[in-house]
Swiss-Prot record:
Pathway, per record: Cofactor biosynthesis; NAD(+) biosynthesis; quinolinate from iminoaspartate: step 1/1
Disulfide bonds: none
GO biological process terms held by the UniProt record: 'de novo' NAD biosynthetic process from L-aspartate
Protein family membership: Belongs to the quinolinate synthase family. Type 1 subfamily.
Identification of the protein by name: Quinolinate synthase
Residues annotated to bind [4Fe-4S] cluster: 125, 212, 309
Encoding gene (name): nadA
EC id: 2.5.1.72
Main location: cytoplasm
GO MF entry, a single one: quinolinate synthetase A activity
Compartments reported by the entry: Cytoplasm
Catalysed reaction equations from the record: iminosuccinate + dihydroxyacetone phosphate = quinolinate + phosphate + 2 H2O + H(+)
Length: 378
């Protein structure tokens, strides 16, 4: 399997997480197969999934052909938490996780007795890399009076150090609840998402200074120029984006919430500030609508990610077939760490289930109002 080595720079917080430095990493991106190779690989993967009694769970950000395979074979295409939850509840004892390493770890934490395989164990995340557990633990130890809330995009060891784990779909509600109870918070690792939640809730939050390689590159000035070209377009923004991008959003939300907004908004054109991988699901969910990628670089500038995560791009048909054939690239989580990491995850799941019941009890109107609560307010 031929591949291209791509060097990657990412935010590497220093000075106890309060100042940004620069870290160096790499991504080994598989070269695209030919049309004939692609067709043969797809058929081989389908047969191997049956042979291995395995199920494929894929993130919205992996390439479209992997998302299609997951859908066609009874798997799942979703955000990281729903991937893990689907795998936990599925009968299959082998889960193939097409995504990045923390997603495989989360799946293993929720399904410790299942075999979790990944196409490439080196597929990582700038947020995970930028929050080493030893440094983060020291940061937490320096502020023992604060509740520790971490984003899903962290290692199992960092989750094990936390009181709560959250996703972008429920983080705001959880922090608002903690704030209402008078709790002060340590937030990690994404500074943009943390700042967004802090402004929306008024919570007392110390922010770790990590960022997502993809979302950090979206540019507010260039987005404003693009909006002038498409004045009727609605702007959909993931909250991992910088403040001057979020400020221009019609909807700020998680991947699933942005797809939902694309369906429900009475508009034909959308500017999308998140990973390009999501456009596949948006186009399926809202056929006939036009989706335009938000800009990641200004004039005469180059982009690091160009709106597609280089580590998500490490998932390909060839290495997916290979992992099914050989049964290697298995995810392991130390049982003691896994047990501790499950506590903040379960705490979030319980909160999310109770929150969902409250929203459903209040009816569809309030749910839609909640979805679009960020219109003009971000």
């Amino acid at each position: 399997m031929q591949s291209t080595i791509k060097p990657v720079e990412y935010d590497r917080p220093v000075a106890a997480g309060t100042v940004c430095g620069v870290g160096q990493a790499w991504a080994k991106v598989p070269d695209a197969p030919s049309a004939e190779e692609r067709a043969a690989l797809k058929e081989r993967i389908k047969a191997l999934l049956v042979r291995e009694k395995a199920v494929l769970v894929a993130h919205y950000y992996v390439d479209a052909e992997l998302q299609e395979l997951a859908d066609e074979t009874g798997g799942c295409v979703a955000d990281s938490l729903e991937m893990a939850r689907f795998g936990r509840d599925h009968d299959a004892q082998t889960l193939i996780v097409a995504g990045v390493r923390f997603m495989g770890e989360t799946a293993k934490i929720l399904s410790p007795n299942k075999r979790i395989l990944m196409p490439d164990l080196d597929a990582t995340c700038s947020l995970d890399l930028g929050c080493p557990v030893d440094e983060f633990s020291a940061f937490c130890d320096a502020h023992p009076d604060r509740t520790v809330v971490v984003y899903a995009n962290t290692s199992a060891a960092v989750k094990a150090r936390a009181d709560w784990m959250v996703t972008s779909s429920i983080g705001l509600e959880i922090v608002a609840d903690l704030h209402a109870r008078g709790e002060k918070i340590i937030w990690a690792p994404d500074r943009h998402l943390g700042s967004y939640i802090q402004k929306k809730t008024g919570a007392d939050m110390l922010l770790w200074q990590g960022s997502c390689l993809v979302h950090d590159e979206f540019k507010g000035i260039e987005l404003d120029l693009l909006r002038a070209e498409y004045p009727d377009a609605k702007v959909l923004v993931h909250p991992e984006s910088p403040e001057n991008v979020v400020a221009q959003a019609d909807v700020v939300g998680s991947t699933t919430q942005l797809i939902d907004a694309a369906v429900k908004f009475n508009a034909t054109h959308f500017i999308v500030a998140t990973d390009l991988g999501i456009l596949h699901k948006m186009q399926l969910a809202a056929p006939g609508k036009t989706f335009i990628a938000a800009p990641t670089a200004g004039n005469s500038a180059t982009c690091k990610s160009c709106a597609h995560c280089p580590w998500m791009a490490m998932n390909g048909l060839a290495n997916l077939a290979d992992v099914l054939e050989r049964g290697h690239n298995e995810i392991f989580v130390d049982p003691a760490i896994g047990e501790r990491a499950r506590l903040p995850i379960d705490r979030m799941l319980d909160f999310a289930a109770a929150h969902k019941k409250r929203v459903q009890a209040s009816g569809d109107l309030q749910r839609d109002q909640q979805l679009f609560a960020n219109v003009g307010a971000a």
